[in-house]
Amino acid sequence: MTRRFALVLALVASSAEAAAGQTAKNYTPADVHFVAGMIGHHAQAIQMAGWAPSHGASPSIRVLCERIVVAQNDEIVFAQRWLREHGEYVPPADPRGHIMQGMDHPMLMPGMLTPEQMAQLDAARGPEFDRLFLTFMIQHHQGAITMVQQLLAVPGAAQDGPIFRFASDVNVDQTTEINRMTLMLNDLKRSSQ
């Protein structure tokens, strides 16, 4: 009986060691695509917001832009760290790195500004910059929400706790900022009449 118990104990211990040696992959390719995509997506938002001081943005737009830069930089750091920790490719935080991979033809990620829109925003100054910034950033944020919805629509995706929290935070933060920016844009339109 002792010998049998020792044998069972040895088998259980060796199974536990084998299981511990294999890291359970609790994420999907959709999770990786989402996290990697957010790096380029957020980099474009940071570039847009970074133009506020040099483009004559109003004080309220500058404050909004500072918040966007801080929040999205933090999320880029999270995304890069998560990808590294999971042995996945970490794309550069390049605002031009916004083409969806795996497509037969280049396609912008949801909400991303085209090169023409970026040039239009970069050329704008003062109240015109404010108006275009709000219009384009609302579009950009709506795209991030679409990316979250696409992730959550994939069976098995966002089961990893940090990814679920990240996607949820993106959804809540972007929705809140869209509401704020819509009010700001409406105020801007009223004041220019």
Each language-model region and where it sits:
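Bacterial N-terminal signal peptides
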Residues: 6-15
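All-alpha RGS (Regulator of G-protein Signaling) helical domain and cognate RGS-like helical scaffolds
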Residues: 19-193
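Positively charged n-region of N-terminal signal peptides that target proteins for export
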Residues: 1-4
